[in-house]
Amino acid sequence: MANIRERATDALLDCGIPMNQSGFLYILDAMELFTENGAPITNMRVVYEMIARKRKHNVSEIMENIKYSIIFGNSNCRTGAWVRYFGFDFVPKTNGNYLAFMWERLREEDARNKNKQR
């Protein structure tokens, strides 16, 4: 997938999640892990542990900061952008649901853009 970090940054900003939140960075890390894996990692504990090792933070910090960023974006975003990237219209889901849906949407958009260029 074309530069997932850049595409996810644009999506998070579009959803009203500010870059100065720790969760913003951790969500980008999760998107990179999913891309390296070729699919979302279903055990979020593994994702949190990998990010915690990379960032030298504890797992609960990673989980809570991602959750806070998602909640913040959910309450400050235009509905259309939120549904586009997270797929759920203000219905509480798990971090894993949100991140997997976002990664899948970015992957689908990337595939559509490649098809348009042909």
Regions found by a protein language model. Give the residues of each.
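Histone-fold modules and their flanking histone-like tails across chromatin and transcription assemblies
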Residues: 1-46, 93-118
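C-terminal engagement/docking regions of AAA+ P-loop ATPases
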Residues: 54-55, 64-67, 71, 75-118
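Short alpha-helical "recognition helix" segments of helix-turn-helix
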Residues: 47, 51-52
